[in-house]
């Protein structure tokens, strides 16, 4: 044996263990996504790049929703995001509303909306029309 000693091939190779999430520069867990893809019976085999890509997409969507919800919370002078802020963020964004159109958010409420027919009619005041009738 040229290697000598008790150290096998794995000990020297795993000196600096690095997760797949950190390799990809992601915060979402690539390993967990890979495990869920395998256990979910979506396909017989799962490629190595699929969980990385899916974790990146999920992280982007979460960041986008939290960004908009944070803006909604700040507009309401709050420092904590509540389900109402998530609802406002998703429903006011055209693409997110299309993606999550059939999703119900608990304690989210509804968007404030008054139909145009129910609003009071705006009367166009003209300077010559009203003054002429009152000058008699």
Swiss-Prot record:
Identification of the protein by name: Histone H2A
Lineage of origin: Eukaryota, Fungi, Dikarya, Ascomycota, Pezizomycotina
Site residues (Not ubiquitinated), renumbered to this chain: 121
Domain comment quoted from the record: The [ST]-Q motif constitutes a recognition sequence for kinases from the PI3/PI4-kinase family.
Residue positions where N6-acetyllysine is found in the record: 6, 10
Record-stated family: Belongs to the histone H2A family.
GO BP annotations listed: DNA repair
Protein's gene: HTA1
UniProt keywords, alphabetically: Acetylation, Chromosome, DNA damage, DNA repair, DNA-binding, Methylation, Nucleosome core, Nucleus, Phosphoprotein
SMART domains, per the entry: H2A
InterPro entries found in the cross-reference section: Histone-fold, Histone_H2A, Histone_H2A/H2B/H3, Histone_H2A_C, Histone_H2A_CS
């Amino acid at each position: 044996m040229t290697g000598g000693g008790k150290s096998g091939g794995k000990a020297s190779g795993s000196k600096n263990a690095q997760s797949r999430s950190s390799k990809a520069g992601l915060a979402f867990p690539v390993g967990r996504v890979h495990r869920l893809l395998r256990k979910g019976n979506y396909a017989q085999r799962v490629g190595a790049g699929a969980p990385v890509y899916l974790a990146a997409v999920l992280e982007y969507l979460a960041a986008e929703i939290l960004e908009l919800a944070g803006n909604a919370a700040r507009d309401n002078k709050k420092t904590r995001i509540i389900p109402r802020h998530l609802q406002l963020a998703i429903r006011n964004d055209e693409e997110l509303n299309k993606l999550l159109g059939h999703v119900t958010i608990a304690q989210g409420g509804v968007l404030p909306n008054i139909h145009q027919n129910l609003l009071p009619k705006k009367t166009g005041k003209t300077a010559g029309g009203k003054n002429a009738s009152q000058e008699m």
